Amino acid sequence: MPTARSEQELRNLLRSPIQKAINYVLDKIYDENISVVHDVVYMAYSPEDYNRTGDLYRAWSTESKSTSSAAQGEFKYDYSKMSIGSTDPQSSNFAQHIGVSGDFYGQDARPYLAEIVYGAIKWGGAFGDKFPRQRDAWTELNKRIGRRKMKQWMKEGMEAAGLTVQMHNTPLYVEES
């Protein structure tokens, strides 16, 4: 069993397993998000003005990094993973993530698409018409995960990385001797 003789040795010892645990949690969040996007966004209604691409399922990325004193992970909207459509009304990709009228004609809507869908921002016909109502998958994702799943996934991730852990509901007080 490895032994740490200083705080820095302990940090060095735990850095890799904790980073692996964070990656595990990020993968779980990514998978849960696919389910939430399906339920909240795609099953909410069927559009009449455009064909769906399903790109919002995959428009997310994860990133993890560690420093000498911290490890962290990030789950975020990544519009670069989405396709951009056409302004041609005859195209099957008409109005897919692109402005089709007025001042927004030909402008890429992907950077704002999550805000448009989740927040029901009213753009009129500029980025596809008639978003019927807010379909806030982000809030639902946070509700579904909550503190319990986050804690459970972190424990599972740390155990998968080779650490034996015991989770607590209150912070532990450590006294150095």
Language-model region placement:
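N-terminal, Lys/Arg- and Ser/Thr-rich interaction peptides
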Residues: 1-20
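Charged, low-complexity interaction tracts
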Residues: 2-4, 8, 46-177
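Conserved aromatic-histidine-acidic binding/catalytic patches
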Residues: 17, 21, 25, 29, ...
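Non-globular disordered terminal and juxtamembrane segments underlying protein topogenesis/assembly
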Residues: 21-44, 150
